[in-house]
């Protein structure tokens, strides 16, 4: 993505009071290694470095990298890397968590990368409030893809007045907690096809009338617009059984 576009979409939180208020909802300790997505001017970086074992910040803007590096020059447990997070290769065979106040206009790309390319046990992200709600909406394909790998929760609402420049909308702090994958590698493609047909309401391409009735009954679904992820998995498993 164009660096200028990313830079223009960034909104910073600089108040120590607001930062500490947000971090009270983030479960970190002195043993944690953190990958921070976007150091900004180092305000969150500074507080993370005080709390955690080691912090690696990934920042696309070289000017912000210099500002952050100078701000944390006395911290030996901190480094900032000048790189686009979408081009960054997450470490393998290493335990870490992720924290980031991420640009609104690439939130989907960043979250996909975290979920499907990293091994982070927990990821704490500041995102636009409406986007956070969409991540919990099982009528949307993105939510149905992500939930196979992580549990998603909204931890707090963050007023737009906390940021500068002030965005048009409020934000949320969310957490993605990794769990064992609920879809096997061999079923992944079939699951993706099922999701896309389901969200497009192409039920006739997935089930016969009788199969659909049986699948809904087994999953205990009364309202197609209000189903849990576990119920959706039940539908997919029924689909697999009908198509063996």
UniProtKB/Swiss-Prot annotation:
It comes from the Bacteria. Its EC number is 2.1.1.184. Keywords: Antibiotic resistance, Methyltransferase, Plasmid, RNA-binding, S-adenosyl-L-methionine, Transferase. SMART domains: rADc. It catalyses: adenosine(2085) in 23S rRNA + 2 S-adenosyl-L-methionine = N(6)-dimethyladenosine(2085) in 23S rRNA + 2 S-adenosyl-L-homocysteine + 2 H(+). S-adenosyl-L-methionine binds at residues 11, 13, 38, 59, 84, 101. One of its GO terms (molecular function) is 23S rRNA (adenine(2085)-N(6))-dimethyltransferase activity. Pfam families: RrnaAD (PF00398). One of its GO terms (biological process) is response to antibiotic. GO terms for cellular component: cytosol. PANTHER family: DIMETHYLADENOSINE TRANSFERASE, DIMETHYLADENOSINE TRANSFERASE-RELATED. Belongs to the class I-like SAM-binding methyltransferase superfamily. rRNA adenine N(6)-methyltransferase family. This protein produces a dimethylation of the adenine residue at position 2085 in 23S rRNA, resulting in reduced affinity between ribosomes and macrolide-lincosamide-streptogramin B antibiotics. Is involved in erythromycin resistance. This is rRNA adenine N-6-methyltransferase. It comes from Limosilactobacillus reuteri.
């Amino acid at each position: 993505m164009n660096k200028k576009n990313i830079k223009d979409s960034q909104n910073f939180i600089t108040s120590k009071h607001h930062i500490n208020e947000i971090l009270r909802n983030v479960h970190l300790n002195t043993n944690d290694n953190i990958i921070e997505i976007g150091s900004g001017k180092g305000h969150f970086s500074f507080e993370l470095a005080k709390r955690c074992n080691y912090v690696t910040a990934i920042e696309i803007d070289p000017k912000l990298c210099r500002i952050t590096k100078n701000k944390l020059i006395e911290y030996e447990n901190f480094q900032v890397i000048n790189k686009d997070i979408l081009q960054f290769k997450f470490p393998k065979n290493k335990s870490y968590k992720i924290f980031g106040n991420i640009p609104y206009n690439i939130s989907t790309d960043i979250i996909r990368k975290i979920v499907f390319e990293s091994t982070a046990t927990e990821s704490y992200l500041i995102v636009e409030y409406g986007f956070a709600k969409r991540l919990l909406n099982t009528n949307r394909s993105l939510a149905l893809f992500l939930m196979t790998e992580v549990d998603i929760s909204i931890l707090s609402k963050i007023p737009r007045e906390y940021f500068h420049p002030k965005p048009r909308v409020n934000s949320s702090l969310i957490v993605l907690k990794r769990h064992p994958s609920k879809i096997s590698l061999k079923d992944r493609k079939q699951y993706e096809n099922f999701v896309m047909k389901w969200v497009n309401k192409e039920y006739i391409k997935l089930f016969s009338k009788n199969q659909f009735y049986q699948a809904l009954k087994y999953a205990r679904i009364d309202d197609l617009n209000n189903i849990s992820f576990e119920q959706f998995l039940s539908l997919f498993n029924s689909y697999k059984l009908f198509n063996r």
